[in-house]
């Protein structure tokens, strides 16, 4: 998997005109007086100092546990930077397996009449939010924020797990100094992985931890037989020894901010980060256990998990319904579609992710609600029951990132995949307006992994192989200096899905507001929407539009914008270069056929020339053709994007094509009196 962020670390000596003290509580008057970041004067805030420490501690009877300690000091320059004063720390919290946040303290510093004043973070600024059934966001909001404030806070996370969370090395604001340290007992071997273009390297050293380790049985180091991280002691006999720590440190200055660009799937996918994959555990008895995995290992481990497999294979609760919905159907693909549509209507998604069931498939079926695992493992079971070759496809949602190596921990979602006649059919029954091979937006994230009971697996593309189409037809004429138009739009596939998801329960007034172009003077009326509820059809719209701003009378000549209020007004791609891909979401075709009646007594004296622009490798194209036919101005415009993701090396070509689009769509037709 290729990432497109290049992290350039440059040392700027003498850039900060004062010596900073990085100890907690030692905020200086000079830091408070600083009006803007010397290197990034437009930033709303800067991390002055960030420290992130990971270590493992031995506790008799419990084994090793992980402790994470974080300290951050942030300078806020503008009110727009106040969002950095609210911090969320995600911790695992499910049943008896939980991480605990503690030792939280923080202060806000302000300069008042030349004196440094500080205000303590109080309990009324600390609160928790449940993210899902497995994670909590421990949040706190710093008090008395002002432009010019400096905030600092520190906290610890106690974790019973050996897995080390990904360590972010870059934010959307600059980081002036960052220190990372990991102290890892010699028994635990990790593979350190970074974004391929994030130029980082850790210094390495060793020390001796003077702690006696008493080992009971084979699992005494805090690794369970299946899930690494949880302590399971047992057996007879014991031994003791001290151990050494492997120490990894990173100390960097002036880390640039992650640039916010338009059309990005998930900006966090491209930030610099350090990933630590548990590869092996060697306990003092010398019995190694490997955790490095291939995709075959991942597949085997999932199919060995009873909580997953038993739910996927459970089938006694739906058989009467299954018989009814497949009655009279002989074609396997018809059975597949019938079952898929039934599950979509039967069980509603509770907004919780995860490829493991939450309520259990039977309970979800009976109560009509469940998480992603409940719904789609149920779907797989029903498809298998009618002898379709259905298996799970694991994936990571856009918000969860992209797995860099074979792992089951990088996935947070499961869909159904059916292999039939050398074709693969993907289905997600949690999304009522999706369809076969048309996944919801949250699930279209690079590749998934189809896993089979025989231990084999394969990568699966999650983007559709065909374009979604939107077609717009306009009949217009100029009446009393105002362009009056009748518009018909047909939205297919993902265009229809997105419209339904946004407006299915909305009144017409909300839909009219959604149709109005931003910063355009357009009145829309008489809106009719057909097939909004029918997932198998296009969404069809028709409405009347009045647009006075698209025509201008200058000295008796009429200057008309033939694209009306559909013109692309500005190029979304303004940066000179780009470090990450352009994400369009899915292939699409956007086509306009516009017919404008030439006013009586006028003739066309200037008409925009046609163009045809193409991106290389058939990634996309743009066609514009205007002509005068039988008293009408006829305009045909089509934008086609065939690649849902266009790599950063092709950015300049995309930018150039959109420059042409903006220029062409804002050209005028000139009408003069005949």
Question: Model segments located where?
Answer:
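Bacterial Sec-dependent N-terminal signal peptides
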Residues: 1-24, 674
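A sensor for short, sequence-defined functional sites
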Residues: 20-674
């Amino acid at each position: 998997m290729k990432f497109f962020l290049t992290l350039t670390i440059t040392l700027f000596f003498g850039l900060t005109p004062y010596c900073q003290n990085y100890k907690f509580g030692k905020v200086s008057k000079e830091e408070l007086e600083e009006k803007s970041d010397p290197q990034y004067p437009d930033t709303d805030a800067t991390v002055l100092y960030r420290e992130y420490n990971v270590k493992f501690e031995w506790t008799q009877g419990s084994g090793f546990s992980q402790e994470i300690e974080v300290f951050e000091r942030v300078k806020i320059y503008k009110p727009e930077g106040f969002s950095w004063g609210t911090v969320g720390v995600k911790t695992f919290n499910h049943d008896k397996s939980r991480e605990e946040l503690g030792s939280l303290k923080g202060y806000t510093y302000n300069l008042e009449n030349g004196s440094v004043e500080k205000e303590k973070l109080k309990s009324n600024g600390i609160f928790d939010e449940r993210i899902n059934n497995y994670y909590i966001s421990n949040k706190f909001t710093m008090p008395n924020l002002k432009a010019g404030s400096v905030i600092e806070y520190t906290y610890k996370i106690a974790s019973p797990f050996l897995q080390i969370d990904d360590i972010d090395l870059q934010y959307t604001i600059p980081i002036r100094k960052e220190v990372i340290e990991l102290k890892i007992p010699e028994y635990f071997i990790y593979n350190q992985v970074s974004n391929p273009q994030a130029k980082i390297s850790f210094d390495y050293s060793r020390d001796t931890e003077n702690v006696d380790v008493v080992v009971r049985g084979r699992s005494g180091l805090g690794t369970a037989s299946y899930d690494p991280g949880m302590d399971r002691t047992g057996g007879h006999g014991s031994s003791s020894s001290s151990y050494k720590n492997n120490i990894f440190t990173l100390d960097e200055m002036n880390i640039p901010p992650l640039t916010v660009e338009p059309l990005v799937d998930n900006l966090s996918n491209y930030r610099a980060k350090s990933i630590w994959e548990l590869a092996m555990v060697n306990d003092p008895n010398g019995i190694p256990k490997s955790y490095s995995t291939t995709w075959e290992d991942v597949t085997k481990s999932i199919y060995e998990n009873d909580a997953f497999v038993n739910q996927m294979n459970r089938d006694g609760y739906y058989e009467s319904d299954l018989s009814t919905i497949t009655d009279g159907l002989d074609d396997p693909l018809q059975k597949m579609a019938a079952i898929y549509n039934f599950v979509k209507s039967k069980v509603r998604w509770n907004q919780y992710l995860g490829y493991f069931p939450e309520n259990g498939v039977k309970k979800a079926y009976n109560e009509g609600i469940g998480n992603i695992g409940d719904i789609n493992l149920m779907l797989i079971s029903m498809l298998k029951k009618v002898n379709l070759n259905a298996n799970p496809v694991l994936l990571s949602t856009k918000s969860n990132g992209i797995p860099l190596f074979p792992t089951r921990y990088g996935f947070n979602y499961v869909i159904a995949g059916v292999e039939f006649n050398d074709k693969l059919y993907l289905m997600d029954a949690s999304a009522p307006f999706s369809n076969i091979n048309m996944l919801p937006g949250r699930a279209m994230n690079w590749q998934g992994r189809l896993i089979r009971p025989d231990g084999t697996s394969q990568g699966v593309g999650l983007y559709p192989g065909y374009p979604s189409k939107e077609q717009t037809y306009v009949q217009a004429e100029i009446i009393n200096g105002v362009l009056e138009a009748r518009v018909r739009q047909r939205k297919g596939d993902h265009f229809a899905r997105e419209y339904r998801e946004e407006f299915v329960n909305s009144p017409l007034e909300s839909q009219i507001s959604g149709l109005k172009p931003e910063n355009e003077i357009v009145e829309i009326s008489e809106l009719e929407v057909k097939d909004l509820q029918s997932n198998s059809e296009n969404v069809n719209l028709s409405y009347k539009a009045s647009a006075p701003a698209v025509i201008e009378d200058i000295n008796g000549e009429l200057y008309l914008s033939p694209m009306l209020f559909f013109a692309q007004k500005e190029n979304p791609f303004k940066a000179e270069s780009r470090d990450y891909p352009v994400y369009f979401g899915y292939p699409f075709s956007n086509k306009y056929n516009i017919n404008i009646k030439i006013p009586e007594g006028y003739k066309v004296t200037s008409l925009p020339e046609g163009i045809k622009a193409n991106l290389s490798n058939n990634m996309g194209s743009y066609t514009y053709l205007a002509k005068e036919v039988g008293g009408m101005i006829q305009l045909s415009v089509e934008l086609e994007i065939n690649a849902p993701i266009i790599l950063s090396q092709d950015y300049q070509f995309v930018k150039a094509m959109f420059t042409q689009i903006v220029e062409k769509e804002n050209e005028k037709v000139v009408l003069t009196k005949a």
